[in-house]
């Protein structure tokens, strides 16, 4: 099985939008895993963690996320899909989602961490489109920072997200 030993370090809390921005993240594990499988795991994990955070709406050209595996765990090397890969992927995703939330909560001027979960969308892409519209919305940010639960602003952001939405089924 994949090692339970992970080390992590991430930094960056400005110019984090939409895809990592000027953040740095270095991850290490003792797991034995092939370069192809670790690359696949990292790309899929970054897509659903670091590439989904927004702090200030500005994008930087500089970002890095690296994962290194030294193989010292002594596990049978992960060279393809299967239970061991799924375990490794789940652990890597957990670590990256945690780091992404920490970066967003430490954002320049951030007083709150807002997460948006979309359920019932026709596709993951539409759900992501709606969620990003909500968390990027300056009006939603003002409402959250001012502790004014103005749900109309959330609905407005969902409406202009560009996804197919049946407004009669929306519940905020």
Spans of model-derived segments:
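Short, small-residue-biased leader/transition segments that mark boundaries at the very start
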Residues: 2-6
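Signal for well-folded cores of large energy- and translation-related assemblies
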Residues: 14, 28, 43-46, 50, ...
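Mobile "lid/hinge" segments at catalytic clefts and subdomain interfaces of large enzymes
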Residues: 14-74
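Short acidic, glycine/serine/threonine-rich loops at helix termini
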Residues: 17-22, 77-79, 127-129, 156
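A short beta-alpha structural unit
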Residues: 65-67, 111-123, 151-161
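A glycine- and small/hydrophobic-rich beta-loop-beta segment
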Residues: 70-146
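Internal helix-turn-beta structural module
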Residues: 128-132, 136-172
């Amino acid at each position: 099985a994949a090692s339970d030993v992970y080390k992590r370090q991430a930094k960056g809390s400005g110019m984090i939008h939409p895809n990592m921005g000027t953040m740095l993240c270095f991850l290490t594990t003792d797991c034995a895993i092939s370069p192809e499988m670790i690359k696949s795991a990292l790309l899929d994990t970054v897509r659903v963690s670091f590439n989904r955070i927004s702090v200030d709406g500005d994008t930087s050209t500089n970002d890095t996320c690296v994962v290194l595996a030294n193989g010292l765990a002594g596990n049978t090397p992960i060279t393809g899909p299967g239970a061991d890969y799924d375990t490794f992927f789940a652990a890597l995703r957990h670590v990256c989602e945690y780091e992404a939330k920490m970066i967003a909560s430490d954002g320049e001027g951030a007083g709150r961490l807002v997460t948006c979960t979309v359920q019932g969308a026709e596709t993951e892409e539409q759900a992501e489109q709606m969620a990003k519209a909500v968390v990027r919305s300056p009006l939603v940010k003002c409402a959250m920072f001012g502790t004014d639960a103005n749900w109309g602003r959330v609905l407005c952001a969902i409406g202009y997200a560009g996804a197919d939405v049946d407004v009669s089924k929306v519940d905020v």
